[in-house]
Amino acid sequence: MSAFNLERFRFDKGKKIDTEFGEKGASSRPSTPNSQLEDHVTSIPETPEAKRVNNPSLFKKDKGVSFLDSDSENEDHQSKSKFSSTHQQSHPREENGTSDSVTDDSEDDYLAVKRPSASTAQVKDGSKYKNLQRLKEIFPKQNNDELLKLIESTSTLDGAVAAGVVLFNKEGSSRKRKLDEVPKDSSPVHEGINGQTKKKKKIDRVSSDNDSSLSEDDWEKQEASVKKLQRHFPDLDKEELREVLQEHDWSFHEALEALKLFAEDETDALQNAAKKEVSNGKEFSRSNKNDNKSSAKAKANQNSNKAMAQNGVKKKGKGKKYSENAKRDTRDLESEESASDAGSCLDEDYSSGDEKLEEEYKTKILSFLQDASLDELYLIPHCSHKKAQKITELRPFSSWESLFEKMTKSNGLSEDLIWDCQTLIKEREVVMKLMNKCEEISRTLTKQVTQLTEDGECGWNIEQPSIMSENLVLKPYQKIGLNWLALLHKHKVNMILADEMGLGKTVQAIAFLAHLYVTGDSGPHLVVVPASTMDNWIREFNQWCPSMNILLYYGSQEERKHLRYDILNKVVEFNVIVTTYNCAISSAEDRSLFRRLKLNFAVFDEGHMLKNMSAIRYQHLMTLNARSRLLLTGTPVQNNLLELMSLLNFVMPHMFSSSTSEIKRLFSSKAKSTDEQTIFEKERIAHAKQIMKPFILRRVKSEVLKQLPPKQDKIKFCQMSKKQEQLYSDLLNKLKKSIDATEKNSELCNVMMHLRKMANHPLLHRQYYTADRLRTMSKLMLKEPTHCDANPDLIFEDMEVMTDFELHRLCNEFTTLSQYKLEKELILDSGKFNILEKLLSDIKKKGDRVVLFSQFTMMLDIIEVFLRHHQHRYVRLDGKTQISERIHLIDEFNTDMDIFIFLLSTKAGGLGINLTSANIVILHDIDCNPYNDKQAEDRCHRVGQTKEVKVIKLIGKGTIEESMLKISQQKLRLEQDMTTNDTGDEGTIPLDMATLLKTSLGL
């Protein structure tokens, strides 16, 4: 089918006219200057005969060889890219405008049409006239001039017919419009310039026509038809296929029919042309027999289209829906055409395959629509919940005909949904193939571990690398992790170490880099970490592996510039580069460094930061030039399965990248969440577990750390104070009215945030500082030396957007406003503070210490006032704390037992820090993502903890926080499903691999 390439009928955009002449005519006659050539080709039909320029021919008339002027010649240039110049057919220019071979009156009429045009070659024999008449029968609406151009631009009648199908549509020839736009006086030099813009003009014209008359949905459907057609004819240009579809009123099957009807004959013609060797100026031609055959074929095409229209091909809507009879007729014709093409594959349209495959997929579609759940039906492209519900109401579908009839006759449904099922089925097949690949990898790894265990090879047991500190020893489960990493690396498989937080993933990664070092791979390696854990990584490297050279890539832009120079010019020696996510991708120079630097191994700490494959961070880090990758994350499954698939795609892009779109659709959380887990959801979880099995190792603390103290979770529902409850109710009613007016998702997010703030503390809104009070305060601010020249109206505008607590701090800062400070009772007026006061008092009596988290830094500001009021000693760390100061604050809290409370913001203090000196975790306000809270609470519940850990969550009773808690529990259930083995006990992933490794190591 690739030989059927209509590109050769288009204008040549690249070649120069004088190059053509130089190759063919230089030896016969000197070439004419450009000025003369320009005069020759710019004679227009309206020029009188007496004044017409009549230059001599540029070349000698070699036998059987002729040359056309600029218009015709451009048609031939494209063809020359496909065939030898000796295989092309043109006709010699007759200077007097007549041909000796023409004798009858009808031929004279034909010449009368062509004689005025300087761009038309003359008729040499009667065969051209016969071809013209045949084309006239096939394209009765086109004039002789257009049809003759087709004959001259192709070597066969079949080619002319095929070109005509593409170029002529029912509303007029777009090709003719295109030619009319070219100035008549364009010279060969100008022609080359104009030719470069012709395709763009054509695209713009088609786009503008469609945009003005079609809706966005119709345009998308038309684009889908073009793509489907291009899969059958990959060598054809999209715009040419679009014209074929326009010719057939955007009927995909009719357009496919028309193109396939001529493809076979055109292929034969091209093959025959390639076999014939034309030399010494002998003219290549087709026999009349073949011409008759192709003409009959073209007529058959017209007749078949008419017959289809008469036999029940009904166009519905905008020409995209057909009756079942039409589908059957179309498939019969396609089956005849594809009988000779045994290698044709099933593509977007199942009816284009052979009969067995077609019936097989019909059966799959019928079975799917009959048995699929609502969630599965909802995954069909363009299928809404309402349509899915209608499909279930139409069941049962006893046969294909019954399905087709019910779908086409039901309001709101169409046959498009039937054929869109193929997309979903195809995506499922892609995921199944991916699962089979993963299963094969898993079997290979399991087989090797089993074999090594049975053989008892001592060399398999990878001990703690010799360059690691002798004073520190890996724990047994950490040694298993090291061996697992080494095994997968040996098989060139990247991995995700997903041990539960607190099991020492950092140490296992350092041990693996040390193992690479002692086995001959000294780097360079890269470790990318969050800013909050960078100091901890440097400390762990120095403690566990002091002999490795660690380079910290961090600092200002100027400092990183010098570091880049040293790295690229090998001024500094290093084995491992440690940097942050921000420094690795913040500028083009940073990204360029890690693309140019050939890294042997890259480690990404807190890998769940790469859970969104559409994020800029994800896409930039994918370009790192690393041979192997390792992700460390304590929460591989957070909101949905798609995030897990994103992690797998990041570590194994060569395996997953080709299936990204299928993975996105099948594992996206399009279906609505329900309390009961559907069969479909269970199947998706099973599929995800099978895919992730070879690449992820996860152990939980309850299994591997028998000596680790238990952790208790407790939820405290806090009744709001009376004033707070009234304010919350007023805010809720106000927001309900605004939601009814807008109903936008962005507004809903704002509503949720406003309610969360009010549930935590009333001072996070502006309630007490009225507009009148702010007017007075803005004028008083003019008495301050820093604001004496300020505009009070601008000060008022700034104050309007501030919260009550911010305005209270402003009053503390400026003495002129001190009279407007809030009373301490208002600051302490919070339902959660009432619970917290008693809670902290009891904890302090027992001698325990507290780590308190909040989502809002302003809430931490208010909590500081509360702690000072009750004389509790504390330290604080949030996103504004300098990176260099964070490690000192952590050390201070862990060593000074008089510090009772460590205040942290959940995002800044919830990652990668060790606070085992405390055993009580209080979450003042929960996160929408429960895994952020889990990360936070595991700052205490980790290796090194000796006391029982209690996690207390404060939930505002009767507030939006209760709904957030319910959603969080559903998300946590997904993780439990993913980390549960086949027997139902929570365990490792994959269980069998870790068990085998444990056995092989004798642990």
Curated annotation (Swiss-Prot):
Domain of life: Eukaryota
Region (Disordered): 15-130, 172-235, 274-351
GO BP term, example: DNA double-strand break processing
Residue intervals of the CUE domain: 221-264
Alphabetized UniProt keyword annotations: ATP-binding, Chromatin regulator, Chromosome, DNA damage, DNA repair, DNA-binding, Helicase, Hydrolase, Nucleotide-binding, Nucleus
Motif DEGH box, chain ranges: 605-608
Compartmental location: Nucleus; Chromosome
The EC number(s) this enzyme carries: 3.6.4.12
Family from the record: Belongs to the SNF2/RAD54 helicase family.
PANTHER family cross-referenced by the UniProt entry: SNF2/RAD54 HELICASE FAMILY
Protein name: SWI/SNF-related matrix-associated actin-dependent regulator of chromatin subfamily A containing DEAD/H box 1
Source organism per UniProt: Xenopus tropicalis (Western clawed frog)
Name of the coding gene: smarcad1
